Amino acid sequence: MNPPDPVVAKLQALVRIPTVSTPDPADLDTAAFDALLDALRAQFPRVFADLAATRVLDHGLLLHWPGTSADRPVVLMAHLDVVPVDTSAPWQHPPFGGDVVDGAVWGRGTLDDKGSVAAICEAVERLLADGFVPAQDVWLSFGADEEVSGRCAPAAVEALRGRGVRPWFVLDEGGAVAHDAFPGVDRPLAV
């Protein structure tokens, strides 16, 4: 059996950490979220060495990657939390196993949304290694309570606003609202 692709192994490691969100922050397993933040730092060392990181509330992250210009900042969003496991139905594979079966990683967060976190961080890690500097400032915004419509995303917005950042483009879970992106379209457009 071949060892997994390094990127797959990184996602598996994130999936294996049960960062289950709860409506009441007092019920949160903070050790799991601390472990996930530690895993991100270990797996993506350039990201955390080269980008200015700010904690948002307790477990959210805002990372700034300066570009050659700051006039049209880009925000790439994802979230670190997952929904609780429904134990009323049997699972094909353990929800926090991160098993690779038929070429797919199985587990909580693979699609919603640790897969996005891993993909964003891996892309930035590789671009940093290549010495790439983006044309515009790029902000990575990783929330920790999206599944319960928590406080992290609004706090990240306020943190950006406090820095005078007005995003030109925001990508969250695969879609975006674009401004002035298409000829003849003069209003924001969800794509």
Which residues does each PLM region occupy?
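Acidic/histidine-rich catalytic neighborhood of metal-dependent amide-processing enzymes
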Residues: 111-191
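Acidic/His- and Gly-rich active-site-bordering loop/insert found
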Residues: 1-110, 130-134
